[in-house]
Design a protein with these regions (language model features):
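C-terminal outer-membrane beta-barrel translocator/porin domains of Gram-negative envelope proteins
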Residues: 6-9, 13-102, 106-110, 114-116, ...
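Short glycine-rich, acidic/polar surface loops and turns
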Residues: 89-91, 128-136
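Outer-membrane beta-barrel transmembrane domain signature
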Residues: 110-130
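Outer-membrane beta-barrel "beta-signal"
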Residues: 135-142, 160-171
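Conserved active-site loop/cleft motifs that coordinate metal ions or position small ligands
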Residues: 105-107, 143-149
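A short, acidic, flexible beta-alpha connecting loop/helix-capping segment that sits on the rim
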Residues: 150-154
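Short beta-alpha connecting loops at secondary-structure transitions
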Residues: 128, 147-149, 159-163
């Protein structure tokens, strides 16, 4: 939890809670369960500025374009004051017999974004979810990730992203 003053006189409390557990069910198979909750609130009671609102990152909700789900005002996604995500991932290692650097990944993601303080009619608090399969490839230039995801629950205004390619890793 932190209080931050960012480029103005508005002081915002930004609270985070992250939980992650790893489990090896058999040799080289690692399954991960992750839960994240984040909230932002103005200590002065003012509405949180658009630039300070929270969005769901694409790596936490595959199958949707990063920052393109949740409350909208006209054609603009406006984020929210609260975000929660749940991710379940399992790795199927060495599926290709002679290739040691490629793993197949199965995943299920769910997330929610809510809390529009200036207009509650814009607040769409439906849970979005997706399932998919990915390929993790450790190359000499670094890890490459290819993922294909299919949204299960969504809102009509959400923007889908079935395929995603990433270079590098997140911590």
């Amino acid at each position: 939890m932190s209080d931050r003053l960012v480029g103005s006189e508005m002081c915002i409390r930004d609270s985070n809670y992250d939980y992650k557990i790893f489990k090896e069910f058999y040799e080289n198979n690692v399954s991960t369960f992750a839960f994240s909750l984040r909230g932002a609130s103005s200590l002065s009671g003012d509405d949180i500025k658009l630039s300070e609102r929270l969005y769901i990152p694409g790596r936490k909700l595959r199958g949707f374009e990063s920052g393109k789900i949740g409350p909208k005002d006209g054609s603009d996604f406006i984020g929210g004051n609260y975000v929660s995500t749940i991710n379940a991932t399992t790795t199927i290692p060495k599926i290709l017999e002679n290739v040691q650097t490629v793993d197949i990944v199965l995943f299920a993601d769910a997330a929610n974004i809510w809390g529009v303080d200036y207009d509650s009619s814009l607040d769409k608090s439906g849970i979005r979810s997706s399932v998919g399969v990915g390929l993790d490839w450790l190359t000499p230039v670094g890890p490459l990730t290819f993922s294909f995801a299919q949204p299960i629950t969504k809102e009509p205004t959400d923007i889908e992203e079935t395929f995603r390619f990433n270079i590098g890793t997140s911590f």
